[in-house]
A protein has these predicted regions:
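Short glycine/serine/threonine-rich phosphate/pyrophosphate-binding segments
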Residues: 41-42, 101-107
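Gly/Ser-rich helix-loop-strand patches that form or flank binding pockets
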Residues: 109-127
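Catalytic core of DAGKc-family lipid kinases
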Residues: 124-198
Length: 198
C-alpha cells in the first residue's frame, strides 16, 4: 500500500520494495553482526557502521564480528564491542550482513530478546536477508526514520528429554534437525507438537 508522500520521496524504487510508514520510538542502539570473513561482507559492515555513526547513534558489534580477519577498524569511527549473547539485550535493532545462514545464526543469540533484525544480503538466496547491499545505507535511514514494515516470524521452542528430565532446550527460526552425531546410525525418538504426538 503506497501513499503519495512515499511515491514522491522514493520514485526510483518498485512499489513492492517500498516500506510502509509505521511510526515507532527511534532506534538508538544499533547492533551490527556478520558471519562470513568475505571482503564483500566487511565492505557492507563498514558502510553500515559509518551510516550509523553519521546519524549519531550508538553502534554495537559482537566480538565474533569485530574479530573478522577482513574487518579494518581504522575505517570505523566509534563502536562498542560486546559478547554475542548480550547484543540482543542491549540493542534496539540488529543489522545482520550475510546470507540467510547468517540470519539463522544470529537468531540463535537474538530470539529470546525479540529485537527486530534487518538482513543485508551478501549470500545467494536472500529469503530472510532481503535488503540489497547497494541499498543498505538508504534502507537503514528509512528504517531509522520509522518507514518500515515489521514481519513477525514464528519461533520454534525445542526440548530434548530423557524420560521426564529436560536435557537440552533451545529456540529455532526455521527447523530443528535431530541427528545421531558423527557416526551414521538409526535413532529412536518420539516427537510432539504442543503436547500432541506427531
Amino acid at each position: 500500500m503506497e501513499n503519495s508522500a512515499q511515491s514522491a520521496r522514493l520514485p526510483h524504487l518498485h512499489e513492492s520494495e517500498l516500506f510502509h510508514a509505521i511510526k515507532n520510538p527511534a532506534f538508538r542502539r544499533i547492533g551490527l553482526m556478520g558471519r562470513a570473513g568475505k571482503r564483500s561482507v566487511t565492505q557492507s559492515l563498514v558502510q553500515i557502521a559509518n551510516t550509523i555513526n553519521e546519524m549519531n547513534l550508538t553502534l554495537i558489534m559482537d566480538v565474533q564480528t569485530a574479530n573478522l580477519p577482513t574487518l579494518n577498524f581504522t575505517e570505523i569511527e566509534k563502536v562498542k564491542i560486546v559478547k554475542r549473547s548480550l547484543i540482543g539485550e542491549i540493542c534496539d535493532l540488529v543489522i545482520v550482513v550475510g546470507g540467510d545462514g547468517s540470519i539463522l545464526h544470529a537468531a540463535e543469540a537474538l530470539a529470546r530478546y525479540r529485537v527486530p533484525v534487518l538482513g543485508v544480503n551478501r549470500g545467494r538466496l536472500g529469503f530472510l536477508a532481503d535488503v540489497k547491499p547497494n541499498e543498505a545505507a538508504f534502507k537503514l535511514r528509512q528504517v531509522l526514520m520509522g518507514d518500515y514494515q515489521l514481519d513477525h516470524r514464528f519461533l520454534l521452542t525445542m526440548e530434548i528429554r530423557e524420560g521426564r528430565k529436560i536435557i537440552h532446550e533451545d529456540m529455532a527460526l526455521n527447523d530443528v534437525v535431530l541427528h545421531a552425531g558423527k557416526s551414521v546410525h538409526m535413532i529412536d525418538f518420539q516427537m510432539k507438537i504442543d503436547g500432541h504426538d506427531v
